[in-house]
Amino acid sequence: MSASQPVFETLLDGITEHRRGKVRDMYEIDDLLLMVATDRISAYDLVLGSAIPNKGKVLTQLSSFWFAKTGHIVTNHMISTDPSEYPEPLQRHKNLIQGRSMLVRKTKPITIECVARGYLSGSGWKEYQTNGRVCGISLPTGLKESDKLPEPIFTPATKAETGHDINISEDEAGKLIGNALVSELKRLTLALYGYGAKHAESRGIIVADTKFEFGLLAKNGQNEIVLIDEVLTPDSSRFWPENEYSPGGSQPSFDKQYVRDYLDRISWNRNPPVPELPDDVIARTQAKYIEAYELMTGMALA
């Protein structure tokens, strides 16, 4: 598998498929999971017909970077990203999954998304324009789109299998999973965001907002909260170049901006069939993902 050839899907013979998400193919290996990040890309909640070469490698290697750096804040589910350390049945798939896979512990996923926002953008900006609040949190009047908030806020959302996640208040989250658990998730979410945003700022990147997912892992008769899925990637976060930041509108970003711009330009109705992306949009999007990884980590993508 050449470095430039995108991986749209994986079919690992002899390995039980757990589920297939918009980007990741998941496999069961005894009591563990193998997460393989493909190069699929979605927009408006649909997987597009084109893939972005190396996107899955960026997501996996950036998540691995953050899992390694945030262990002092919260335990995570990562075991290894080195296929030579994986169970024997996976060895014959090494060339396909190298650099884009992660062996993880199975957890019981907590059924809310944990979003931290340091800047007013996206769905938060839309809600603020309506009622001056975001997920029930009152904000100062007169804020502009992309303004920095007085302090980061925790804005949970429900997990949607299809379609958009729905923003909810802390109280609503408490009714779903319990107030004590929500309180601890809020603490962890804001601690992770604060740590990540500070590191990113030192690398010239603003983390406007980001989404974390957590699971529960049985340990010594107790349920331990564990950080799962992906962490501070261009797919789960809004990354802005600090030297181009100008509040009062949308910002340039290290993500699928070129894809969204193209889809808007061709007036796609956001329903199937999904369009193919032209080569220049694919190339520029790939470059943005790799630039985000290399800026954030100071390392070349493996």
How does the language model describe each region?
Residues I177-A208:
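A long amphipathic alpha-helix within ATP-dependent nucleotide-binding catalytic cores
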Residues A116, V207-E230:
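Conserved metal-phosphate-binding beta-hairpin within the catalytic cores
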Residues S2-A157, R270-E276, D280-A302:
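Active-site loop/lid in soluble adenylation, ligation, and acyl-transfer enzymes
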Residues L32-D39, K126-Y128, G163, G221-V231:
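Short, well-ordered strand-loop elements centered on a beta-strand within folded domains, enriched
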Residues Y44, W125-K126, K219, S236-R238:
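Intrinsically disordered, low-complexity acidic/polar segments
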Residues R105-T107, S202-T210, G215, Q286:
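Short, active-site-adjacent segments that bind or coordinate small-molecule cofactors and metal centers
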Residues T130-L181, E224, V231-M296:
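Anionic ligand-binding catalytic core segments
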